[in-house]
Swiss-Prot record:
Belongs to the peptidase S16 family. ATP-dependent serine protease that mediates the selective degradation of mutant and abnormal proteins as well as certain short-lived regulatory proteins. Required for cellular homeostasis and for survival from DNA damage and developmental changes induced by stress. Degrades polypeptides processively to yield small peptide fragments that are 5 to 10 amino acids long. Binds to DNA in a double-stranded, site-specific manner. ATP binds at residues 360-367. The gene is lon1. GO terms for biological process: cellular response to heat; protein quality control for misfolded or incompletely synthesized proteins. This is Lon protease 1. It is found in: Cytoplasm. Induction: By heat shock. Its main location: cytoplasm.
Length: 795
């Protein structure tokens, strides 16, 4: 071969192959320019450059579409086929680097041959030659499609030239164009051998992995065939025994349902495992019944089924307003949640459905509000009553080892609704109890914790179940009996008692039309606002509207009976004066405060789970030895408030003109009427102090002012709870002036405007301010004075 330096030769672009030096290759040439290049080479010294295209899809490659390194080759033979294609045999002599292209009707370039460099490390090259030959032999043994004839294999085995070996192996191996081009572009022989060896070892690892996978697949196929064979045998045996065909059909149906159910993979595996156990049992055995029941539960509980949600907050607002009057805070919270869902719809946003806890007196609409939320969101609704539940298994279910075991109320509810995204109402969560069987409140921690409930595990199912899409709502009358860890999982929304105005609106626009329709008197019966107001004040005493609804129902039923006995024309209107004919004698007298000042009595305000109420506190001081008697079914906190008030008065005796030594010379009796009703809490502190000061000084107390506030030994007035309920009670009782702790001022925004405009609120920080407002000058002294100071007598 003559010494190649720089040559100007035709260029033959190659689409799907890389020709390496020291090899002879056949190339089909079909493109017009490529044919011209071959013909030009044949007409000259038969030399040309073979260069691979970067993109095989390019039909008319430009210089920039070709790699810079190719092969200098000699055309050994060319034959034209009937379709015009040239079949060319080329012998690759050496690597070549193309330097520049020359303008011509075909691709033509100036390039230079790249001679093989001398070996840098002959010993390393020798070792690499042996390793490459050994690896290539194993490569041929394991390759599924590559087959070399005896002469080709011998050429690889016998060569000791490292450069030739690297090119021959790369030529025969089924590597990508990019990998072969990398070998072509590697000038150093040792580096070239290393790359060839690395590619061979990579492929050998792949072959081993393929073998393992194939063996595993074959083993699985053999196992499936074996199971199929045994199953067919079992069918035949059962058929001979009689009665087995139905059982095997049932097994196949269960298997098909499991495959189609869309369970999570671990659940599916457990179901199939249980099905295999069932298959080996006698159809009528008790164990088979247990397995069937378990599989039925797994198949009937929803895993992926979901209702499409309505995420239009205008629709939701309309539905909530249709069903409930007022409850602004609750509705606002639901609309906030839906607004976020609407804005993030279709996005992967990590978030959880809120877990709301509605707290309020009976009859304010907590349960019905849950139904409205479900209706407004187009979700299915399920209610679970927790009142009196004392067994943990009611929540988590029983383990299958027990006879008659079933899942808990949560999983039963999910089966009932049939979707993974219902609204669940856990009613009366404050009335849970516990005993030796466990604490259901502790079991609810997992249900109501957004970080845990996506893997809730019922003891019966014994597989993780995702509750994260369930919208949980709980209801309670009071927070005091809910365990703190459970309460921490919930967003508490207080639903206070309704005002007289709200009750009148609810009765007028919601409950009365419903009761008239139920009685079949639409268009024949009406009721006045005065009648509704009288029912609220004299026939019911509640924070909600349940009894009001019951009384309205009585009126409608009584009118229906009257209509059947003696039909009337037009519309009958029920007025306040007619109520005794429909409802009988009033059950309550309106809660009215005393107007005249009293000695030894003070008007307090209290809050109960059923709403606010007036709390009159009486105090009497009689000659004695300093005993303090507290009556009226008082709790420990209220008794401590009484002692704190008494200590404050002792410390400020001179300021308020109290008898000297009264704590030793007089017995004090503090009483709170309605002794059958338990009372507790610190908010009666200033009321007790006022009643005691009045009893000890004989100064009357203004009874047209009600008060509430906790007292300290220093005479400070601390904030209290239930402000809205207490102000509603004062307003309903006809009191227009109320004393509140100054720190409660911010809570007035929760009180309806129509109530506030009728009230004069006095905010106080010290007990002294209270006593100055309430204590009037003492009455004229009696004609005959006793031997020692005599305090006023309590009312």
């Amino acid at each position: 071969m003559k010494d190649f330096l720089r040559l100007e030769l035709p260029v033959l672009p190659l689409r799907n192959t890389v020709v390496l030096p020291h090899t002879t290759t056949g190339v089909d040439v079909g493109r017009l320019k490529s044919k011209r290049a071959v013909e030009e080479a044949l007409s000259a010294d038969r030399l040309l450059f073979l260069v691979t295209q970067k993109d095989p899809e390019v039909d008319d490659p430009a210089p920039e579409d070709l790699y810079a390194v190719g092969t200098l080759a000699v055309v050994k033979q060319a034959m034209r086929l009937p379709d015009g294609t040239l079949q060319v045999m080329v012998e690759a002599r050496s690597r070549a680097r193309l330097l520049s292209y020359v303008a011509a009707p075909y691709l033509r370039a100036v390039g230079e041959a790249i001679p093989e460099p001398p070996l840098k490390d002959p010993e390393l090259a020798r070792v690499l030659v042996n390793e490459v030959q050994e690896a290539f032999e194993r490569y041929l043994q394991n390759h599924k499609t590559l087959r070399l004839d005896r002469y080709q294999q011998e050429a690889v085995k016998s060569t000791r030239d490292p450069a030739i070996l690297a090119d021959l192996v790369a030529h025969h191996a089924t590597w990508t164009l990019e990998e072969k081009q990398t070998i072509l572009e590697t000038p150093e022989v040792e580096e070239r051998l290393k790359r060839v060896l690395a590619l061979l070892l990579r492929d050998l690892e792949r072959f081993e992995l393929d073998k393992k996978i194939a063996a595993r697949v074959k083993e699985q196929m053999d196992q499936n065939q074996r199971e199929y064979y045994l199953r067919e045998q079992m069918k035949a045996i059962q058929k001979e025994l009689g009665g087995g065909e139905d059982f095997l059909t049932e097994i196949e149906e269960l298997r098909e349902r499991i495959e189609k159910k869309g369970m999570p993979e671990p659940v599916k595996e457990k179901a199939l495992k249980e099905l295999k156990r069932l298959e080996r049992m006698q159809p009528g055995s008790p164990e088979a019944t247990v397995s069937r029941t378990y599989l039925d539960w797994l198949l009937e509980v929803p895993w992926t089924e979901a209702d499409p949600e309505v995420l239009d907050i205008s629709v939701t607002k309309r539905v909530l307003d249709e069903d409930h009057y007022g409850l602004k805070e609750v509705k606002e919270r639901i609309l906030e949640y839906l607004a976020v869902r609407q804005l993030t719809q279709g996005k992967e946003v990590k978030g959880h459905a809120p877990i709301l806890c509605f707290v309020g007196p009976p009859g304010v609409g907590k349960t019905s509000l849950g139904k409205s939320i479900a209706r407004s969101m187009n979700r299915r609704f399920h209610r679970i009553s927790l009142g009196g539940v004392r067994d943990e298994a009611e929540i988590r279910g029983h383990r299958r080892t027990y006879i008659g075991a079933l899942p808990g109320k949560i999983i039963q509810g999910m089966k009932q609704v049939g979707v993974v995204n219902p609204v669940f109402l856990l009613d009366e969560i404050d009335k849970l109890s516990s005993d030796w069987r466990g604490d259901p409140a502790a079991a609810l921690l997992e249900v109501l914790d957004p970080e845990q409930n996506h893997t809730f595990t019922d003891h019966y199912l014994d597989v993780p179940y995702d509750l994260s899409k369930v919208f949980f709502i709980t209801t309670a009358n009071t927070l005091s009996t809910i365990p703190r860890p459970l309460l921490d999982r919930m967003e508490v929304i207080e639903i206070p008692g309704y005002t007289l105005h709200e009750k009148r609106a609810i009765a007028r626009y919601f409950r009365w039309p419903f009761q008239v329709k139920e009685a079949g008197l639409e268009g024949r019966l009406e009721i006045t606002d005065r009648a509704i107001e009288r029912i609220v004040q004299e026939y019911t005493r509640e924070a909600g509207v349940r009894n009001l609804d019951r009384e309205l129902s009585k009126v409608a039923r009584k009118a229906a009976k009257d209509y059947l006995e003696k039909p009337w024309e037009g519309v009958r209107v029920v007025d306040a004066e007619d109520l005794e004919a429909y409802l009988g004698v009033p059950k309550y007298r309106p809660d009215r405060a005393e107007k005249e000042p009293q000695v030894g009595a003070a008007q307090g305000l209290a809050w109960t789970p059923y709403g606010g109420t007036l709390l009159t506190i009486e105090a009497v001081a009689v000659p004695g030895t300093g005993k303090v008697n507290l009556t009226g079914n008082l709790g420990e906190v209220m008794k401590e408030s009484a002692h704190a008030a008494l200590t404050y008065l002792r410390a400020h005796r001179e300021e308020w003109g109290l008898p000297e030594g009264f704590h030793k010379d007089y017995d004090l009796h503090i009483h709170v009427p309605e002794g059958a009703t338990p009372k507790d809490g610190p908010s009666a502190g200033i009321t007790i102090a006022t009643a005691l000061a009045s009893a000890l000084t004989g100064r009357p107390v203004r009874m047209d002012i009600a008060m509430t506030g906790e007292i300290t030994l220093r005479g400070r007035v601390l904030p209290i709870g239930g402000v809205k309920e207490k102000l509603l009670a004062a307003h309903q009782a006809g009191i227009h002036r109320v004393i509140l702790p100054k720190e409660n001022a911010a809570e007035l925004k929760e009180v309806p405007e129509e109530i506030l405009k009728d009230l004069e609120i006095h905010f106080v920080e010290e007990v002294g301010e209270v006593l100055k407002l309430l204590l009037l000058p003492p009455p004229p002294p009696p004609a005959v004075q006793p031997d020692r100071p005599q305090p006023g007598v309590g009312a």
